[in-house]
A protein has these predicted regions:
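Beta-strand elements within well-structured catalytic alpha/beta cores of enzymes
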Residues: 1-3, 42-45, 49-52, 74-79, ...
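Histidine-centered active-site microenvironments of extracellular/periplasmic hydrolases
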Residues: 10-12, 47, 55-123
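A long, amphipathic alpha-helix that forms part
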Residues: 21-73
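A structural signal for well-ordered alpha-helical segments within the folded catalytic domains
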Residues: 36, 43-51, 105, 135-142, ...
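Flexible glycine/proline-enriched surface loops and loop-helix/loop-strand junctions
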Residues: 30-37, 77, 89-95, 114-129, ...
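C-terminal cap/loop subdomain of S1 sulfatases and analogous C-terminal strand-loop tails that border
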Residues: 83-103, 126-129, 133, 138-237, ...
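Active-site His/acidic residue clusters
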Residues: 1-38, 84, 91-92
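Long, internal low-complexity/basic segments
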Residues: 228-232, 237-279
Length: 279
């Protein structure tokens, strides 16, 4: 079974979830009440997750007598975009916020646990494992398909699908894997501003060989609309997560630009895809 619970709506905290109070219940680390509706809503997310995990912990798994559902559930926690507000408190070391092609618009936390499948052990006493592999939420299609042993749809034809989905299951298990092919975050923050030079920008994001480090090349709106390549900005995220130093005009990075442009050219158009046929 698949479930995707979310607490997106309404955009104010509930009075309570079951027997757990929410509105007016959020506290700082000191234990003092925050008296903040926004922080109550953040706390509601914590309550949602805790209640779900508690249910999985106490419910027997009918597929595996003697075990609870938590052991054989692939639990994923993430967000569909960056922080709503442009604030150091919300976005930390990242530039911009929700809707932007900069890292603050789409770089989000991602947590995974599946004890029976070798993804963590589900114990709070055990330190988690970190992974710096490039990942996109559309990768969850291929990841779940591999976890349940199902093939992906074809890349062409009437029933095609998952053309930009790459399984992250091996990386979740801690195995060494080849770098993921490029991803293409886009910008809907500026896309509706018809007078903006930055409307509908797209970025090419890659850690793949022959690149050394985490690189990101920005293309203007002509890529999204006409598949034309007009680079605007280049950042080395390994050293510049804030995206503050544009390296595009530095000749020593011309090969990086060339590689990323080729990635964009390959993926352009209605027939473009990043998943290889063997995936």
């Amino acid at each position: 079974n698949f479930a995707s619970p979310s607490n997106h709506s309404p955009y104010t905290p509930s009075e309570a979830l079951g027997e757990d109070p929410v509105a007016g219940a959020s506290t700082f680390k000191s234990g003092t009440l925050t008296n903040s509706q926004r922080l109550d809503f953040v706390y509601q997310n914590d309550v949602h997750v805790a209640r779900l995990l508690d249910f999985l912990d106490r419910t027997p798994d009918p597929r595996r007598p003697g075990h609870m559902l938590r052991d054989n559930t692939l639990f994923l926690f993430s967000s569909d975009n960056g922080a709503e507000r442009s604030s150091k408190v919300c976005t930390g070391p990242l530039r911009s916020h929700k809707g932007s092609v900069y890292e603050g618009g789409h770089r989000v936390p991602f947590l995974a646990c599946w004890p029976y499948g070798g993804v963590g052990d589900g114990r709070v006493e055990t330190p988690g494992r970190e992974c710096a592999r490039l990942c996109a939420l559309n990768d969850m299609f291929a990841t779940v398909a591999e976890a349940i042993g199902k093939p992906l749809p074809p890349l062409h034809g009437h029933s095609y699908g998952a053309e930009d989905s790459i399984s992250q299951l091996a990386a979740m298990k801690g195995s060494l894997t080849a770098p993921r092919v490029a991803i293409f975050p886009n910008d809907h923050k500026e896309a509706s501003k018809k007078t903006s030079d930055k409307r509908a920008w797209v970025a090419v994001r890659s850690n793949a060989t022959p690149l050394i480090g985490e690189w990101k090349l920005f293309l203007d709106h002509r890529y999204a609309w006409q598949q034309e390549l007009f680079p605007q900005e280049l950042y080395n995220l390994t050293n510049d997560l804030m995206e503050s130093e544009n390296l595009l005009d530095k000749p020593e990075y011309s090969r990086v630009v060339g590689f990323l442009l080729e990635q964009a050219r390959t993926a352009a158009g209605d027939e473009g895809y990043t998943r290889q046929p063997a995936e």
